[in-house]
Swiss-Prot record:
Belongs to the three-finger toxin family. Short-chain subfamily. Type IA cytotoxin sub-subfamily. This is Cytotoxin 1d/1e. It comes from Naja atra (Chinese cobra). It is found in: Secreted; Target cell membrane. Keywords: Cardiotoxin, Cytolysis, Disulfide bond, Membrane, Secreted, Signal, Target cell membrane, Target membrane, Toxin. It holds the Pfam family Toxin_cobra-type. It comes from the Eukaryota.
Length: 81
């Protein structure tokens, strides 16, 4: 009975991912990446000339301000970019 209880506790910890980490999409290769500590936002960067295709994706700590040439879209859930 103790073994079963211990097994359930371990499975619960693994499933809950107590040290929650954010996963963001990358552009190259097209896959998700686990963000390092402190980088708690995902972002997409677009050139203002073509807002349909992102030119860069990844993890970031603070969402940059848009400029005349570049637009950033930031979010804070897994693979939201």
């Amino acid at each position: 009975m103790k073994t079963l209880l211990l097994t359930l506790v371990v499975v619960t910890i693994v499933c809950l991912d107590l040290g929650y980490t954010l996963k963001c999409n990358q552009l190259i290769p097209i896959a998700s990446k686990t963000c390092p500590a402190g980088k708690n936002l995902c972002y997409k960067m677009f050139m203002m000339s073509d807002l349909t295709i992102p030119v860069k994706r990844g993890c970031i700590d603070v969402c940059p301000k848009n400029s005349l040439l570049v637009k950033y879209v930031c979010c804070n859930t897994d693979r939201c970019n």
